[in-house]
Structures are given as C-alpha cells and as structure tokens.
C-alpha cells in the first residue's frame, strides 16, 4: 500500500500552513478539483485559485518541486485509492474483519520486532544531545506520539509536520543529531530525493529508519534499520507504527529506571 507523492506533499502542506494562507488555498483547490486541474496550465490554476503566477511558482518550490511542470506531471499521474478491508455488506462483519486485521498486524509486530535493536536505539536516544523524530502523514502521527512519550520521560525531541521542513532539517543536521524516521512502506526518501539533496560527509547525523519494508537497507543516509513484519495494507498502517513507537518509549522508560537503581 503506497501513497502517491502528490497527496503526501499536498496534505503535508495543508497540515503545516495556516488555513487562510495562499499555499493552503492552492493545495485545497487541487485536492478538491483533481480531475479538473489535470490539464490546467499554470495560468489556469492561478486564475482558479485567485492567486498570481508567482504564487503558484512559490507554492511548487515550497513543496520541494522544481517548477509547475513537475507539479502538473504529479497531478497527471495521481490516482487516489482507498483499500477496503472487508468484502461483506454486513456492518458488523465489516467491523470484525477490519479489527481482525488490526490485531493480526500487532501480532506481527510482537513476533518480529528485534528488542536488541530497540535497546541500541534507546541507548542512542539517551546519549545524543539532539533528537528528531520524523514521518509523513500517519508516520508523522507515530513520530508525534513518540515525541510526546519521550518528553514525559524527560527527553525533549524535535519534529516537523511539513515534509519539506523535515528535509531541510536533515540537510543541516550534524554529528550531534539522532534522527528517527518512521516509514511504513520504506519509501520516505523516494518522495523528495531524486537529486540526493543531502551531501554525505563525515559529520552527518545518525539516522534510524523504522519500517515494515524488509527491502530497505543501510545506506549513506541510513545508519540503522529497525524492521517489523507487515502485510503493507491499510488496516496495519497506523497501528503497527504506533505500536513500535510505544515499545521504544516503554523500553526507554525501563532503561532510565535501570540507570537509577543503586549498584549491588
């Protein structure tokens, strides 16, 4: 189950912008009139949104796109889909089928999550002076939940709703930064990395990548990968990420409690 790049970028733009801002106005119009704007020119879109041509160009740059041509290409190739969890016409059966899949997804996390790796991540959380937790849409929800839990445990961490702001932070982070990325499908870097904007160097942050995609490997941008088994479907998506985030927080709480115990 993969979300297209356009919905990700537009929803991230809406979540991070004032409802009355020009960028929100443009993003809302595109999402509400997707078929209508598929073949629109930049002049047509500006007219329909009651904004200037320069506002459309700035909107594209704010989303990390090169220009309007790239935006129009994304609009043309976007096909919104929703995965239905049950084939039954009965509401009670629909509920049961959906929740059964949710329970199965949590069981997969229980069986597959490597607690030794969780322990290494927890040590990094305790050790690094700067912590950031990022994700996209439902991944960012898991990031915010982990941020909140860490704060309750006395560890401040940073996050950003806007995807482009996450990328900017990754560009500027250094060896004092620990960055935790939640990416259910494992394609976080595919959304805005065609030109590999982050230059690899010796003073890069340590990046933990949490995903249900076992094809993701360590790279010049990813130091550690924390896997969980996943069927990569809609019912699993938010709950598996949330479960992993909660287990990280619980493990960190136990780690802190262990540090406070007097030596025998």
Per-region residue spans from a language model:
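Key DNA-contact positions within bacterial/archaeal DNA-binding proteins
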Residues: 54
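Linker/hinge segments immediately adjacent to helix-turn-helix/homeobox DNA-binding domains
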Residues: 1-12
């Amino acid at each position: 189950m993969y979300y297209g790049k356009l919905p990700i970028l537009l929803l991230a733009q809406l979540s991070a912008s004032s409802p009355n801002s020009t960028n929100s106005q443009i993003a809302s119009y595109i999402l509400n009139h997707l078929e209508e704007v598929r073949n629109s020119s930049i002049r047509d879109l500006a007219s329909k949104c009651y904004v200037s041509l320069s506002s459309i160009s700035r909107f594209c740059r704010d989303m990390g796109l090169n220009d309007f041509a790239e935006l129009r290409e994304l609009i043309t190739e976007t096909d919104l889909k929703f995965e239905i969890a049950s084939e039954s016409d009965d509401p009670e059966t629909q509920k049961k089928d959906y929740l059964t899949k949710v329970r199965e997804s949590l069981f997969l996390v229980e069986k597959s999550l490597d607690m030794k790796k969780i322990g290494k991540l927890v040590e990094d959380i305790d050790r690094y002076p700067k912590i950031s937790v990022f994700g996209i849409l439902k991944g960012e929800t898991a990031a915010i939940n982990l941020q909140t839990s860490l704060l309750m445990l006395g560890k401040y961490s940073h996050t950003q709703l806007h995807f482009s702001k996450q990328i900017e932070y990754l560009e500027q982070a250094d060896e004092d930064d620990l960055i935790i990325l939640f990416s259910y499908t494992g394609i976080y870097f595919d959304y805005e990395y065609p030109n590999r904007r982050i230059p690899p160097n010796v003073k890069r942050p340590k990046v933990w990548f949490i995903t249900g995609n076992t094809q993701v490997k360590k790279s010049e941008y990813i130091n550690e990968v924390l896997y969980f088994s996943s069927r990569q479907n809609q019912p699993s998506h938010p709950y598996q990420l949330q479960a992993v985030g909660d287990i990280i927080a619980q493990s960190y709480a136990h780690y802190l409690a262990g540090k406070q115990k007097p030596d025998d």
